[in-house]
Design a protein with these regions (language model features):
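Acyl-donor-binding surface of acyltransferase catalytic domains
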Residues: 1-13, 168-275, 417-421
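Short amphipathic alpha-helix that is part of the acyltransferase structural core
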Residues: 1-88, 92-106, 113, 117-130, ...
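A conserved beta-strand-loop-helix scaffold within acyl/acetyltransferase catalytic domains
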Residues: 38-64, 72-74, 134-144, 291-352, ...
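General structural concept
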Residues: 132-139, 147-151, 166
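Conserved hydrophobic beta-strand within the GNAT/NAT acetyltransferase core sheet
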Residues: 150, 183-187, 355, 391-393
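A short, internal acetyl-CoA/4′-phosphopantetheine-binding micro-motif in the GNAT/acyltransferase core
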Residues: 151-159, 189, 357-366
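Conserved acetyl-CoA-binding loop-helix of GNAT-fold acetyltransferases
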Residues: 160-176, 360, 366-379
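Short hairpin/turn module used for nucleic-acid contact or packing/dimerization
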Residues: 362-424
Length: 424
């Protein structure tokens, strides 16, 4: 890595001071420049509030983030003694490289070694142009959780300098100290290469799927990752056509009458529920199996569970980030949730939604419940958003049935993504 770049970990639960806001803005800028490079800026944009919310979860949250930043060494306004060389004043800036939440998660053992008097310190003012990359590690703070999710972003003007490798090394080392054994990441093929390759240089999976050997995939493989799955990022632009709405409405109407559909925003549960806590217990129980039910190719899969408190903490975090969660669920005659779907209205760009989970229990499949979920979410979107622009969803290339359903109502592939995993 270039000698003029410093990589360190942002303090967990960092104070909400102005320098921290500027740093969050810088991280969002790196992400957004990457979206411009990929041609996805109209559909995906980060905000400073999103990063701040991730670093400051509520006590009940089990979803945690660690963020590592690559900063120009010239931006360090203070020397190792903690004195500003330009003013001679003692530093009041928080030290970086210190995970200072030993009482809040399982990283206690690693905090002592990270806490050093010689750790670099955050400048009083972080300029956007001084941040040249970051890595984000998301994980579940539960003893049984062994899998994390790691993303690395290097500013488009600072590639091929080893910055991404240094960021990845720092984040992977943190994952090890947290007791994780696998990290998962994503690489993207830009929109003009969306068709999975057949004969060109590519990595091929046993199921026949393949992903082009783009530089990002080559880099992750050099770090030890293996390609495990290939997905389409699909986009549906609003308004839906009359034909698409007719198809959606007709298919949803075929759901048997003994099922009941519910929909709600954030944690404002449907008022017609007699026992919201019992309903959500059933909802979260089904959701905990989502990962193993989704076509995963060669990936190692880990399910994650929520209590009602931890789920509401996750919703509250996203609300602080300016987002909104749209929920749809279907109950059978016994009151058990047998199908669910969630989508998230993004803070930016306005009117863009990300659909992250759709699941129908095996016992209830083949009865058009999936169509009913899509119809319920569509109704929520158009009734709560004045100008909806698009909804995005991610589907494995091998999931032909879901891709066909989505295509029939107007979704089209926008990006090709390779899902990779590293065993630590």
């Amino acid at each position: 890595m270039a000698e003029n770049i410093v990589v360190f970990e942002i303090p967990y639960a960092c104070p909400q001071s102005q320098p921290d806001h500027d740093l969050m803005l810088a991280l969002a800028t790196v992400f957004n420049r990457e979206q411009e490079h990929l041609g996805t800026a109209a559909l995906s944009e980060a905000t400073p509030e999103e990063f701040s919310a991730c670093l400051n979860p509520s006590p009940d949250s089990v979803v945690k983030h660690r963020i590592f930043v690559a900063l120009k060494a010239s931006a360090l306004a203070e020397d190792a003694s903690g004195v500003d060389p330009t003013t001679g004043a003692a530093s009041k800036a928080p030290k970086l490289g210190v995970a200072d939440d030993a009482s809040r998660d399982r990283s206690t053992a690693s905090n002592a070694s990270a806490n050093s008097n010689t750790a670099p310190v955050l400048p009083h003012e972080v300029r956007v142009r001084d941040v040249v990359g970051y890595a984000s590690l998301m994980y579940w703070d539960q003893p049984e959780a062994k899998q994390g999710y790691l993303s690395v972003f290097t500013d488009v003007d600072y590639r091929r300098q080893g910055i991404g490798s240094a960021l990845h090394e720092a984040a992977a080392n943190r994952a090890r100290t947290l007791g994780l054994s696998i990290v998962e990441g994503w690489v993207v093929a830009i929109s003009d290469r969306i068709t999975p390759p057949q004969r060109e240089a590519a990595v091929h999976l046993p199921n026949g799927d393949s992903f082009p050997m783009v530089p990002e995939l080559a880099a992750t493989m050099s770090w030890g990752y293996e390609l495990g799955n290939v997905e389409y990022m699909n986009a549906l632009h609003f308004p839906m056509t009359e034909d698409a709405i007719a198809i959606l409405t007709a298919r949803a109407a075929e759901m048997p009458s003994n099922f009941q559909v519910y929909s709600w925003l954030d944690a404002d549960y449907p008022p017609e529920l007699a026992d919201p806590a019992k309903f959500m217990e059933s909802f979260l129980r089904l959701r905990s199996y989502a990962n193993e039910e989704i076509p995963a190719g060669e990936l190692s899969v880990e399910n994650h569970s929520h209590t009602l408190a931890s789920w509401e903490a996750l919703v509250e975090r996203d609300v602080r980030a300016g987002k909104q969660l749209l929920n749809a669920a279907i109950c059978d005659e016994s009151g058990q949730v047998v199908a669910l779907s969630t989508a998230q209205r993004q803070a930016r760009p306005e009117g863009v939604f990300h659909q992250d989970t759709t699941l129908v229990a095996p016992s209830a499949r083949g009865q058009k419940l999936g169509w009913a979920l899509k119809a319920a979410l569509h109704k929520l979107i158009v009734s709560t958003c004045d100008q909806p622009r698009a909804i995005l969803t991610w589907n494995a290339v091998s999931n032909k049935s879901m891709l066909h359903i989505n295509e029939s109502i107007g979704f089209h592939p926008f990006l090709l993504e390779g899902v990779v995993q590293l065993r630590l």
